[in-house]
Amino acid sequence: MVNCVLISEEDGNISDVEINIVGNDLYRILKGTGTFIGQFPDTNIVIMKCDVSYFELFENRNKLPEPFREEVVIGPILLIYMDEDAEPRDFTVLDYFRQFSSESSRYPCASSV
């Protein structure tokens, strides 16, 4: 089990979530099969979203930090920290805000669309 950051569709809804990367947790949390949006430059933080879902997903009302600020995401966003061996490691909301505190907005991904 590893802690990750879940950015739900609702504005400002950012939380810690504990997941099993090799189990069905990714499917359950993303509400479908997952795909990668990308990785923040100079970090080991990868960004995932739902690729295919049987559920009705909504546009995520939160903005990611640069260079992903303009990325339009349907459904939840999951941030996973990977170590130098590409193994997932704990990453919390507090870690996320510390990492991106130099961004222009007070809360890097809580600004409405």
Give residue ranges: language-model regions.
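Domain-length accessory/inserted modules outside core catalytic folds
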Residues: 1-113
